[in-house]
């Protein structure tokens, strides 16, 4: 199984040179694939520089603003248009997964209807550009969200589009907090377009590097593969000091977990 890693392991990009430096570290650590995280913008101006590093882009993480579920149509449309611009900005990497958070986490069902309207607009753009909208499974955070949309709800939402351009991103670090991950894989059978792989201790979305928590990641990967996933082990973890040696160790540990998958 190929290993990919998200640039979300690095801090927000405050300088245009940072992303290139981050990617050079990732390449030096032995990774060949990345997901470009939502902390990075103005990608279209740096396509050639990114290509010169010799790293391939597996996925793009979108950054759909919260107003995408607003009842104020002007605000909602502004949020959607902002995301459409990001899709255009990263279009050189299509076809690939384009990750979007599932925002229907409030009790009032009207928010869900607004979210669907926004996704319908993004779906049209995804078909135009060749992206696969990959709707991410949500974390269980009752301290933050009014309700928990489980993997069945999210996979049913995805299936309702009946489109190859809408799929699920199974975030095992999110779903592990409330659901059995083998059941999550089964719920998402046939519509898994991307995965986010990190570890936790079962209480919070710690985003630990694979192997540093309590999740049976190899077993989950096997289940995801059996349920139709064909992409890389896409690591999306956090680290306070992601030096090249640290990144290399994350790669080595993840390769051991994925051996012969």
Would you name each region that the model predicts?
Residues 35, 99, 133-135, 169:
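A structural signal for short, well-ordered beta-strand segments and their strand-loop junctions
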Residues 101, 118-120, 132-141, 153:
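Conserved anion-binding
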Residues 11-17, 69-77, 143-148:
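Conserved glycine-rich "GG(E/T)P / GGGxP" loop and the immediately following alpha-helix
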Residues 108-122, 126, 145:
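Active-site cleft segment of glycoside hydrolase catalytic domains centered on the general acid/base Glu
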Residues 1-27, 89-96, 118-121, 129, ...:
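Histidine-acidic metal/acid-base catalytic patches
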Residues 9-11, 38-42, 63-66, 102-106, ...:
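Active-site-proximal loop/turn and secondary-structure-junction residues that shape catalytic pockets
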Residues 66-72, 106-110, 141-145, 203-208, ...:
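A short acidic, helix-capping loop that chelates divalent metal ions and anchors anionic groups
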């Amino acid at each position: 199984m190929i290993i990919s890693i998200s640039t979300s392991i690095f801090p927000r990009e405050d300088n245009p040179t940072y992303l290139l430096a981050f990617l050079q570290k990732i390449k030096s650590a032995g990774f060949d694939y990345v997901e470009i995280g939502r902390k990075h913008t103005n990608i279209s101006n740096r396509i050639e520089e990114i290509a010169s590093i010799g790293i391939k882009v597996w996925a793009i993480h979108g950054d759909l603003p919260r107003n995408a579920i607003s009842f104020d149509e002007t605000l909602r449309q502004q949020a959607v248009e902002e995301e459409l611009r990001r899709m255009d900005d990263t279009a050189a990497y299509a076809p690939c997964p384009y990750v979007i958070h599932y925002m229907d986490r409030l009790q009032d069902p009207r928010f869900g209807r607004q979210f669907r309207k926004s996704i319908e607009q993004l779906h049209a753009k995804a078909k135009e550009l060749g992206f696969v909208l990959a709707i991410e499974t949500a974390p269980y955070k009752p301290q933050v969200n009014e309700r928990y949309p489980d993997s069945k709800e999210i996979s049913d939402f995805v299936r309702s589009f009946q489109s190859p351009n809408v799929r699920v991103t199974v975030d095992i670090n999110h779903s592990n907090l409330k659901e059995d991950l083998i059941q999550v894989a089964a719920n998402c059978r046939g519509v898994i377009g991307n995965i986010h792989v990190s570890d936790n201790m079962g209480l919070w979305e710690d985003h630990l590097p694979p192997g540093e928590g309590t999740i049976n990641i190899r077993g989950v990967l096997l289940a995801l593969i059996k349920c139709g996933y064909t992409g890389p082990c896409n690591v999306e973890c956090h680290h306070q000091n992601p030096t090249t040696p640290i990144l290399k160790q994350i790669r080595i540990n993840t390769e051991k977990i994925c051996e012969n998958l």
